[in-house]
């Protein structure tokens, strides 16, 4: 499975315009062959974070063409070109079955961290973070990849409250593994304001 993460910055006062564009124009036009799921949140003022899951790189390339067409329409809304990172998901698991439908309201945490060695970072997440996921209540899905020296991990929850129960456990593990990271991990958190699952997502899917 392949993931694309898009971080965009809206101009001051234009965040609602960006949200409306994504809801009403972008998502309907971004469906391409191989698309599994898409979602957007607003984790910080004027920051828009999108996550897209696809079957493979070929699907991601098709999505990239559609994405660029949409970005071209946003010159008066975005503060600059979005940051786009994409790659093969190396760790991932679905904890709840989800049907193909439009989705809003999920709470998502996406953590970015510069790392010196991708394999060491992956082993840490596999051995220390995924056991926390496996015991968590209200977790919908989680995954991990490294793109150009930056580790990206994500988890989707029923609610912010469910996520907050386990965040201290994440932080405890992260604080004991500072040597893995070139700089402190940065977490983006927010509620999905626009999203869609294009297929039924099965529990246990990896």
Regions flagged by a language model, labelled:
Residues 1-49, 53-72, 76-206:
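Short S/T/G/P-rich N-terminal loop/turn motif that feeds into the first structured element of a domain
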């Amino acid at each position: 499975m392949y993931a694309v993460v898009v971080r965009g910055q809206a101009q001051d006062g234009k965040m609602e315009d960006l949200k409306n564009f994504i809801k009403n124009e972008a998502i309907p036009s971004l469906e391409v062959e191989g698309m599994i799921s898409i979602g957007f949140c607003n984790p910080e003022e004027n920051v828009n974070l999108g996550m897209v899951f696809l079957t493979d790189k070929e699907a991601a390339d098709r999505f990239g063409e559609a994405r660029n067409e949409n970005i071209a329409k946003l010159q008066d809304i975005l503060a600059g070109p979005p940051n786009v990172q994409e790659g093969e998901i190396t760790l991932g698991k679905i904890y709840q079955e989800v049907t193909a439908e439009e989705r809003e309201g999920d709470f998502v945490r996406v953590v970015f961290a510069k790392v010196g060695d991708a394999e060491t970072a992956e082993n840490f997440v596999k051995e220390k973070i995924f056991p926390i996921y496996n015991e968590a209540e209200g977790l919908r899905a989680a995954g991990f990849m490294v793109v150009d020296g930056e580790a990206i991990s994500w988890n989707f929850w029923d609610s912010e409250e469910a996520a907050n129960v386990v965040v201290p456990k994440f932080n405890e593990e992260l604080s004991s593994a500072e040597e893995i990271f070139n700089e402190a991990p940065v977490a983006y958190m927010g509620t999905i304001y626009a999203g869609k699952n294009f297929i039924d997502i099965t529990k246990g899917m990896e």
